[in-house]
C-alpha cells in the first residue's frame, strides 16, 4: 500500500516546512504537484511494488491511473471511498488525537446529516478535548484544502477527482470499520 499523502509529507519535510505551509504554496508553485504526480504514476506503473497487487491511496491517483491506462497499463481499478461529514470528523479525531477522542466523539456527536463543516464545529468543541478548538480548526483547514486541490487539478489536468464517474467502484464508508469496508471492496472485485 502506497500513500500519496506520505509523498506530500516527505517533500514538506525536505523543504523544512509544515504540510499546511506546503498546501498554501501549491496555490502558486506547480512544481510540487508535478513531482508528486510523477511519483504517483511511477507507483501505478509498478515501481517499488513487489507484490501482484498494489494499492495507491490519495485524492487523485484514480485519475493518474486513467492516464496510465491510456498509456497501456492494465488491471487498474479505481475505487472512491466516501463518508459523511460526521465520519470525516471522527476519523480525523482518531488520527490526530487518538482512540479516546474518537470514542468520545462517536458517543457524543449525534449521527445526523451535517450540512457542512461549520455545522459540526460546535459539536467537536463541546467534546471538551484537550486543544479541541485547535483540532477543529485543523480539521476545517484540512477539509478546505479539498476545494483548492480540486481547482488546482482542474487547472493542471482538466479533471475533478470529486466527479465519481471517474471511478469503477464507489464505497460509502459511513458508520463502518475498516474490516467491513475491506470485505465490501473484495466482494465488488470478485
Residue spans for each PLM region:
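ATP-dependent small-molecule kinase phosphotransfer cores
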Residues: 4-74, 85-90, 94-136, 140, ...
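NTP-dependent small-molecule kinase module
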Residues: 129-131, 136, 140-190
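Conserved AAA+ ATPase "SRH/arginine-finger" region at the nucleotide-binding site
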Residues: 81-83
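Short glycine-/polar-rich loops that comprise or flank the Walker A/P-loop
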Residues: 72-77, 165-167
Amino acid at each position: 500500500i502506497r500513500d500519496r499523502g506520505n509523498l506530500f509529507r516527505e517533500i514538506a519535510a525536505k523543504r523544512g516546512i509544515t504540510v499546511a505551509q506546503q498546501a498554501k504554496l501549491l496555490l502558486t508553485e506547480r512544481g510540487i504537484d508535478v513531482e508528486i504526480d510523477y511519483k504517483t504514476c511511477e507507483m501505478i506503473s509498478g515501481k517499488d511494488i513487489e507484490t501482484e497487487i498494489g494499492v495507491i491511496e490519495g485524492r487523485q491517483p484514480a485519475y493518474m491511473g486513467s492516464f496510465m491506462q491510456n498509456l497501456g497499463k492494465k488491471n487498474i481499478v479505481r475505487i472512491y471511498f466516501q463518508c459523511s461529514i460526521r465520519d470525516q470528523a471522527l476519523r480525523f479525531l482518531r488520527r490526530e488525537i487518538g482512540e479516546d477522542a474518537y470514542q468520545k466523539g462517536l458517543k457524543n456527536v449525534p449521527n445526523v446529516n451535517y450540512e457542512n463543516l461549520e455545522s459540526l464545529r460546535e459539536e467537536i468543541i463541546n467534546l471538551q478535548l484537550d486543544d479541541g478548538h485547535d483540532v477543529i480548526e485543523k480539521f476545517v483547514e484540512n477539509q478546505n484544502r479539498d476545494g483548492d486541490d480540486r481547482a488546482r487539478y482542474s487547472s493542471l489536468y482538466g479533471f475533478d477527482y470529486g466527479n465519481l464517474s471517474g471511478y469503477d467502484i464507489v464505497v460509502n464508508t459511513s458508520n463502518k470499520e475498516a474490516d467491513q469496508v475491506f470485505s465490501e471492496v473484495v466482494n465488488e472485485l470478485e
